[in-house]
A protein has these predicted regions:
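Transmembrane beta-strand segments of Gram-negative outer membrane beta-barrel proteins
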Residues: 22-47, 64-82
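Short active-site-adjacent helix-start/loop capping segments
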Residues: 66, 80-85, 127-130, 244
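Outer-membrane beta-barrel porins/channels
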Residues: 21-35, 40-41, 103-531
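Strand-loop-strand
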Residues: 79, 90-91, 467-469
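N-terminal periplasmic accessory domains that precede
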Residues: 57-63
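Bacterial Sec-dependent N-terminal signal peptides
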Residues: 1-24, 527, 531
């Protein structure tokens, strides 16, 4: 395929605002799934005031103070995304070991400080497994990912010289440089051999597939106390392990001015790994001695993540080229790798909960939680030249602006009930709502002064909508052993954009969003022993 197009159309892509990196990583590392023991999930997670479940260690540490017997529990699950498929050897259904923990209840006396409890719990905080596919999507006016590459090939109103030896290469992204190397954008020179701009490619459709897997594993260490069965207080220190993999396969049907078509393809692989730590404090009050009603409050500090990201980008265009030996090749391909270390601080979280029991046959719980996005930060370590170790970091003010412009406070509502159906048999039902984390016109901004700009290898982004979860379960209790089973249905939609071509306002994407369903089914089982 020859590199010749109607250059007059290129003016359509020269848009106003130009922008940079990754608020989407901040959201991924700030949110959490509804996970834990099957009993906890079966009640929609609304157990922070009711307490006496190992998984409440992560939502209100004081709830562990309600244990009167020691406890150990293990949970496994299976998750299915109905519209998923196999990609990168990741199946649509996958099993998971989701929880393992214990509580040691230490009785101190019959009055005053009655119990001092200690506990540990592992659970999967977030399961990143999902699959998105938009195949054969028509584009308007020949829009192509290369249009965004062309925008990125300009800085302060002038075209950048993208030849390998040029210092201008420091002012754009690896994506743009590889797009230039594969002729997806071609330089335009005037009669004086001066660079005046770039010509993009044109497409009549695109196909986009993305698979993600991995997760965030949470390890909680808890100390809690019970004062007179009326005041419960607790402290939890959380340690987090991040393992996130993303594989993207993108292609376009390109068309030239002779209506000849051929295929452009891009693949992007990304691995994000790291650790994090936070502190959670909680209190539960039973204000009326004769009443089982309880009121709880907890606060979670930001999770302080220390992360390493590695990306590999490959492009192959249908444009032929002739090498130095005079051999003509029918296509052009190029690749590149990037890596960056950075730190993320998730938002603060505040939780207000209430719960009560009716006799020995009904338990009711409800709670509200909020995480304010303005507390989130991205920072970069400042390494010592001598030993490479550092505790110092520099805040990314450019991404602070993006967080404020694109992310919203996330509100979570949980309600749940447990009823005694027969001796030792319990039924549970719950509902869980999480508000959308992104504002209406949020987008992946690839033009800021953020240091992350130099490591950007993707143009796609997904604006996630609100989450609705419905849960139901059964539990069986013996003198020591217990077993629980829960089904969870999660409904969520998102708007998928393969790339961003801005309108005159510099924000709104001209590329039409593609709706995607990220619904999933989850079945989990817990076995435990009290002693």
């Amino acid at each position: 395929m020859k590199r010749s197009y109607f250059l007059a159309l290129a003016a359509l892509t020269l848009c106003g605002g130009l922008h940079a990196q990754d608020i989407y990583k901040v959201e991924s590392l700030s949110g959490s799934d509804l996970n834990g023991t099957a009993r906890f999930v079966g009640m929609g997670g609304a157990m922070s005031a009711l307490g006496a479940d190992i998984s409440t260690m992560g939502s209100n540490p004081a709830a562990i103070g309600m244990f009167r017997r020691s406890d150990v529990a293990f949970t496994a699950s299976a998750t299915i995304q109905p519209n998923g498929t196999t990609m990168a050897d990741i199946e649509k259904a996958r099993g998971s070991f989701d929880q393992a923990g214990f509580v040691y209840a230490c009785k101190l006396g019959k009055s005053g400080l009655k119990f001092f409890n200690m506990g540990f719990n592992y659970q999967k905080r977030r399961n990143f497994k999902n699959y998105i596919a938009n195949l054969g999507v028509p584009t308007l006016d020949g829009m192509s990912q290369s249009w965004q590459m062309m925008d990125l090939a300009h800085y302060n109103g002038r075209p950048l010289d993208l030849r390998p030896e040029s210092p201008d290469c420091d002012y754009t992204t690896p994506l743009t440089l590889i797009g230039y190397d594969t002729q997806m954008i071609a330089p335009i020179y005037n009669d004086k051999n001066e660079l005046t701009g770039y010509s993009p490619s044109f497409a009549n459709s695109y196909s986009y597939r993305r698979a993600q897997w991995g997760g965030i594993r949470q390890y909680d260490f808890n100390l809690s106390m019970n004062w007179e069965d009326q005041v419960y207080a607790g402290l939890t220190i959380g340690v987090y392990d991040v393992d996130m993999h993303t594989e993207t396969d993108y292609s376009e049907i390109l068309v030239d001015n002779n209506n000849q078509t051929d295929i452009y393809r891009m693949t992007n692989s990304e691995i994000l790994e790291g650790t994090g730590v936070d502190v959670k404090l909680g209190i539960i009050l039973r204000p009326i001695e004769e009443s089982p009603f309880r009121l709880g409050f907890s606060v979670s500090t930001p999770i302080f993540y220390d992360l390493s990201q590695h990306s590999y980008l490959y492009m192959c265009s249908p444009y032929d080229y002739t090498d130095k030996e005079g051999t003509t090749h029918p296509y052009t391909e190029a690749d590149g790798e990037t890596g960056i270390d950075y730190r993320i601080r998730s938002p603060w979280r505040f939780n207000l909960s209430m719960g009560t029991t009716v006799g020995n046959y009904l338990a009711l719980g409800a709670e509200y939680e909020v995480a304010h996005s303005k507390g989130a930060q991205v920072r970069y370590p400042e390494y010592d030249d001598y030993d490479g170790y550092t505790t110092q970091s520099k805040r990314d003010r450019a991404l602070d602006h993006e967080i404020d412009a694109c992310l919203k406070a996330v509100h979570t509502f949980r309600i749940g009930a447990e009823a005694r159906l027969a001796r030792g048999v319990f039924g549970r039902i719950g509902y869980n709502y999480v508000s959308a984390p992104f504002k209406k016109n949020a987008f992946l901004n690839l033009f800021t002064d953020s240091p992350s700009y130099a490591y950007s290898t993707n143009t796609d982004y997904v604006n996630l909508g609100a989450i609705n979860r419905i849960t139901a379960g059964l539990g069986f209790r013996g003198k020591h052993f217990y077993a629980d089973a829960t089904y969870q249905y999660q409904a969520q939609q998102g708007d998928v954009y393969a790339f961003h071509v801005a309108e005159d306002d510099g924000i709104t994407n001209r590329l039409q969003a593609q709706k995607v369903d990220l619904n999933r089914h989850n079945v989990m089982f817990t076995i435990g022993y009290k002693f």
